[in-house]
């Protein structure tokens, strides 16, 4: 199904979702040197630049029936994910927008290939009630993927001004040890674990359990301050692709995807909303992440994103406190 109209500002807006049959992924021995443009619109020769075409030399793709697994696949503005079933809340795998290089749909074989730096994800479209239904599903996925690739990596809110700098340099340093300031009571997240569990189902909290295999909880775009050597170490707000898993919080270069900083969640003490200046619209979505030895200030795209990030961090902190109290 192609999603209906939703709020355009939502990074998690669903572009399309349907059942697809997954083939075991194929690894790439060589990472592409450049991201292919979406101008090929998923055509047969639309593999990302830097890929060899050795995996496209067969007219028909081999499909071992013993490995057929049908998953509920969801394409959002900022990520592609697939789930065991439509009702599952925890994804088997989530690939952020900046990790998806290109796609290819083979109408002859009914196969969708999604290219990432490390592997190719291959899915087969299930047979519809008739050929027309099957072709319509492929067409809808093609339209959704073209829209997905034509947008920037995630649905970011572009912020301008003298305190912002979109240019990245290898010697930029993320600013730490800032004064976090008093927390605001506007969005209080100081719930006990028992209160949280009584309000949410336990399956949701399994997402934050650090004992589980590492998996993505959420991802998006946040601004944080960096010291710019070219500006004599003056601090500027700069945007990063960020990812929160059940074990770590990672900041990646918005332009290159290179990991810039990783924080183990065991080191995080608290996450608080800063005492934001309501008179300045651009300064009312700031929050701070506090660890044992540093503090980092972040700016979200909007108020709801800020609240979501705080709640996600708080949830991870709370479940760790519970496990520690139970000596698990």
From Swiss-Prot:
<dbReference type="GO" id="GO:0043325">
    <property type="term" value="F:phosphatidylinositol-3,4-bisphosphate binding"/>
</dbReference>
<keyword id="KW-1003">Cell membrane</keyword>
<feature type="compositionally biased region" description="Polar residues">
    <location>
        <begin position="24"/>
        <end position="41"/>
    </location>
</feature>
<dbReference type="GO" id="GO:1902647">
    <property type="term" value="P:negative regulation of 1-phosphatidyl-1D-myo-inositol 4,5-bisphosphate biosynthetic process"/>
</dbReference>
<dbReference type="InterPro" id="IPR001849">
    <property type="entry name" value="PH_domain"/>
</dbReference>
<dbReference type="GO" id="GO:0005737">
    <property type="term" value="C:cytoplasm"/>
</dbReference>
<feature type="domain" description="PH">
    <location>
        <begin position="215"/>
        <end position="318"/>
    </location>
</feature>
<dbReference type="Pfam" id="PF00169">
    <property type="entry name" value="PH"/>
</dbReference>
<keyword id="KW-0963">Cytoplasm</keyword>
<feature type="region of interest" description="Required for targeting to the cell membrane">
    <location>
        <begin position="213"/>
        <end position="328"/>
    </location>
</feature>
<dbReference type="InterPro" id="IPR016609">
    <property type="entry name" value="Opy1"/>
</dbReference>
<dbReference type="GO" id="GO:0005543">
    <property type="term" value="F:phospholipid binding"/>
</dbReference>
<comment type="function">
    <text>Binds phosphatidylinositol 4,5-bisphosphate (PtdIns(4,5)P2/PIP2) at the cell membrane. Negatively regulates the activity of phosphatidylinositol 4-phosphate 5-kinase MSS4.</text>
</comment>
<dbReference type="InterPro" id="IPR011993">
    <property type="entry name" value="PH-like_dom_sf"/>
</dbReference>
<dbReference type="GO" id="GO:0005546">
    <property type="term" value="F:phosphatidylinositol-4,5-bisphosphate binding"/>
</dbReference>
<keyword id="KW-0472">Membrane</keyword>
<dbReference type="GO" id="GO:0005886">
    <property type="term" value="C:plasma membrane"/>
</dbReference>
<comment type="subunit">
    <text>Interacts with MSS4 (via N-terminus); to negatively regulate MSS4 kinase activity.</text>
</comment>
<dbReference type="GO" id="GO:0005739">
    <property type="term" value="C:mitochondrion"/>
</dbReference>
<feature type="region of interest" description="Disordered">
    <location>
        <begin position="19"/>
        <end position="52"/>
    </location>
</feature>
<protein>
    <recommendedName>
        <fullName>Pleckstrin homology domain protein OPY1</fullName>
    </recommendedName>
</protein>
């Amino acid at each position: 199904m192609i999603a209906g109209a939703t709020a355009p500002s939502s990074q998690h807006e669903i572009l399309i979702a349907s059942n697809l049959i997954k083939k075991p992924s194929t690894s790439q021995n060589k990472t592409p040197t450049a991201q292919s443009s979406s101008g090929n619109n998923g055509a047969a020769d639309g593999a990302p630049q830097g890929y060899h075409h050795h995996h496209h030399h067969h007219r028909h793709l081999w499909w071992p029936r013993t490995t057929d697994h049908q998953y509920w696949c969801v394409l959002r503005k900022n990520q592609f994910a697939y789930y065991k079933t439509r009702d599952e809340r925890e994804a088997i795998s989530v690939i952020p927008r900046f990790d998806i290089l290109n796609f290819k749909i083979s109408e002859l074989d009914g196969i969708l290939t999604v290219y990432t730096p490390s592997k190719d994800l291959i899915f087969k479209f299930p047979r519809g009630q008739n050929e027309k239904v099957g072709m319509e599903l492929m067409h809808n996925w093609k339209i959704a993927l073209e829209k997905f690739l034509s947008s920037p990596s995630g649905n970011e809110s572009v912020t301008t001004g003298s305190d912002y700098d979109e240019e990245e340099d290898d010697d930029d340093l993320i600013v730490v040890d800032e004064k976090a300031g008093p927390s605001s009571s506007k969005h209080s997240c100081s719930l006990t674990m028992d209160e949280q569990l009584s309000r949410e189902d336990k399956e949701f909290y399994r997402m934050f359990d650090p004992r589980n295999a590492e998996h993505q909880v959420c991802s998006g775009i946040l601004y944080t301050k960096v010291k710019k050597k070219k500006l004599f170490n003056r601090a500027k707000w700069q945007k990063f692709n960020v990812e929160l898993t059940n074990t770590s919080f990672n900041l990646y270069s918005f332009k290159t995807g290179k990991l810039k900083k990783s924080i183990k969640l065991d080191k995080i003490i608290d996450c608080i909303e800063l005492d934001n200046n309501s008179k300045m619209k651009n300064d009312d979505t700031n929050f701070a992440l506090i660890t044992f030895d540093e503090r980092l200030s972040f700016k979200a795209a909007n108020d709801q994103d800020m609240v979501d990030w705080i709640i996600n961090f708080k949830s991870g902190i709370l479940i760790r406190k519970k496990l520690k109290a139970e000596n698990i």
